[in-house]
Amino acid sequence: MRATRSHDEREFTFDERDFRRVCRMIRDRAGIHLHPHKRDMVYSRLARRVRALGMEKFGDYLDHVETDPDAELQGFINALTTNLTSFFRESHHFDALAEHLRTRGRDGVRIWCNAASTGEEPYSLAITACEAFGTMTPPVRILATDIDTNVLHTAARGVYPVERVNTLSLQRRRQFFQRGSGANAGLCRVKPELQAMIEFRPLNLLSEDYGLRGGFDAVFCRNVMIYFDKATQYEVLQRVVPLIAPDGLFFAGHSESFGHAHDLITPCGRTTYRPASGVRA
């Protein structure tokens, strides 16, 4: 069994003061609240950045993030964000979306996926749109955003290990993916028609102005709010909900609930919401 280093044997000194400082910085810049039991995870992820920059102390690294944010703030955020995802995760949402899309007609449907991660969710949305409209070129545009620029790069490429795609039915794999061969054996790429439907863009949900046009027919904001406290959740919803069409849908994660924001969104299904009456951009 491979031995692991104890706290005293760590490559870099990382004390409680450093951890509290990291917690404050990631909360202020990304809204993420880190629990005390995440201390070892924080060390492991940020130690890679300290090492990559040739620094010797965590304090020096955190000083660098704060004094030169253009150089390292994004690297700091990327290291601490969690990107657990899969194709058609929480599949009932995609069934509900398909029904919703069929009611929208062919006038141009807009969907916002605001935790795109490595792309499985926005591509699942694109597949759902193709199936709902019965064509590889449905009248649907998808905006896929994430605070982590590294995962957005992976998402835009649309290339995945076969094991990641094998959770899909054989019909979906054949219709929506191209299997690699030779040097690309063991990989699959989403078909160009899916990529053409999606715009990938970095976005921080804590930003005061997202710079987005409203009227989204559906917004997927799943398993993001669990990292925010209730006050931050409400602030984010104040910005997001007015961007949804009055009869549009807001999809949340299975462990997220928003009773404290009943004036903004109203439940209409399993972790599915509509804008509350009177909410406008």
Placement of each model-derived feature along the sequence:
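Conserved SAM-binding loop of SAM-dependent methyltransferases across substrates and taxa
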Residues: 118-135
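A short glycine-rich, Lys/Arg-flanked "PGG" loop and its adjoining helix->strand segment in the class I
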Residues: 234-246
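Core SAM-dependent methyltransferase catalytic element
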Residues: 218, 259-281
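Short conserved AdoMet
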Residues: 106, 160, 245
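A structural alpha-helix within SAM-dependent methyltransferase catalytic domains
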Residues: 98-102, 126-131, 241
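Extended basic-aromatic, gly/pro-enriched interface segments that bind polyanionic ligands
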Residues: 135-220, 224-235, 257-259
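Conserved AdoMet
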Residues: 1-112, 251-253
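Conserved class I S-adenosyl-L-methionine
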Residues: 107-119, 141-143
